[in-house]
Regions:
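Generic N-terminal leader/processing signal
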Residues: 194, 368-369
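Residue-level detector of functional hotspots within protein domains
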Residues: 4, 310, 351
Length: 374
């Protein structure tokens, strides 16, 4: 098995260099107003936010068939499943400590439905799985952002996933897989006076707080159906600089993504991954600019700007890759020639079937290993 793993990693790292992408510009609600794509499903429907000049606000939107549609609420859409159910949060995204956010779900037939809170004033939905189970965070009774709690929403009810320390604790749910496993972060004691680290809730809702980095911070962003977790964190040697990281469900740190070329300790982030184990995010280059990235082997990052022809697209750079679906389509945000933020979707040319095949084989090996050690 070890030999197969080494061979597979070699195949992935060498074949990936031949992959290129076509870019689809995801139009804004208002001309060249800012827009950001945050997630997509396997049908190619994309969600995020876009500036509406008529309301002078960022609004939750989805893109389908080349068209952008507002959900009719402010804020942003953050997740979508293959049934086209969308989740997100309303409110002012530019506020560091929002006082007006509400978690919602949206369907084409039912429109926007608010999910409620845990007794407090605010909530935000971050992700939804194939069964329609939602995670995010909400304020408890008498609480605020510094005491928010991760939640699971199913069968019409929101339930707290708890904190490490009660009642002063803090937690957030960011990603969920089809088994109902959730990842995010939590504080050891409270928000301001203790470290915050990767937290994993198993399918039964049991909280596991993992301090597996040498630094004082880590967070999980997404978990795939094989139990691989991606996110970001700090290391003691590099201070407050954050790096993309990969863990298993036992909290073992599998990889830390260096900056492009493995030099400079400039920082990176892993935002999401698919079931083939392909990871997307960004790395910081020598000019301190964010560059959208993809990793086929879970170890090495590729600057997506080097495998996409931006000529005639209106983009000068692709800055962050936020999500990837089963077909390898990638969505994110870049900088347009007028300086505004623009949403994009990338499709591999041709679709690298061999890469997904070998990636799936690797994921299968990881799954077998997981079953042996859990």
């Amino acid at each position: 098995m070890k030999s197969l793993l080494v061979l597979s990693l070699f195949f992935l790292s060498t074949t990936a260099s031949a992959v290129t992408y076509n870019l689809q510009v995801l139009q804004s609600l208002s001309g060249t107003g800012d827009s950001t794509a945050l997630a997509l499903n396997d049908n190619g429907t994309v969600v995020g936010n876009s500036y509406n000049s008529e309301t002078a606000q960022l609004e939750s939107v989805y893109w389908s068939g080349g068209s952008v549609t507002s959900l009719g609420v402010t804020g942003t859409a953050r997740g979508i499943n293959n049934s086209d159910t969308i989740v997100g949060e309303t409110g002012n995204l530019g506020t560091a400590f929002p006082v007006d956010s509400q978690a919602y779900s949206y369907t084409a037939t039912g429109g926007v439905a608010y999910l409620g809170t845990l007794g407090g004033s605010n909530a935000a939905a971050h992700a939804i799985n194939s069964s329609g189970v939602i995670t995010g965070y909400a304020y408890p009774t008498g609480g605020n952002l510094l005491q928010s709690q991760a939640f699971i929403y199913q069968n019409g009810a929101m339930t707290s996933l708890g904190t490490v320390s009660s009642p002063t604790g803090y937690s957030r749910g960011h990603g969920i897989n089809d088994a109902g496993e959730i990842v995010g972060r939590a504080s050891a004691i409270n928000f301001g006076g203790s470290e915050k680290h990767l937290t994993y809730w198993d399918a039964s809702g049991n909280l596991n707080f993992y301090n597996s980095t040498s630094g004082n911070y880590s967070t999980g962003q997404q978990i795939n159906n094989h139990g691989t977790i991606v996110g970001n964190g700090r290391e003691a040697a590099t201070g407050n600089t954050q790096f993309g990281m990969v863990w298993d469900v036992n909290g073992s740190l599998l990889n830390v993504f260096d900056s492009f070329g493995g030099t400079g300790n400039l920082g990176s982030r892993a935002w999401s991954l698919n079931d083939a184990g392909v990871i997307v995010g960004y790395g910081v280059d020598a000019s301190s600019a964010k560059r959208a990235s993809v990793s086929y082997d879970g170890v090495n990052m590729i600057d997506i700007n080097t495998v996409v022809d931006l000529t005639g697209t209106g983009f000068v750079s692709l800055d962050e890759a936020h999500d990837i679906n089963a077909s390898g389509q990638i969505v994110g945000v870049g900088t347009r020639s007028d300086g505004s933020a623009g949403a994009f979707m990338l499709t591999a040319v041709p679709v690298p079937a061999a890469i997904w095949l070998f990636g799936s084989a690797l994921a299968g090996l990881a799954w077998l290993r997981r079953k042996a050690i859990v």
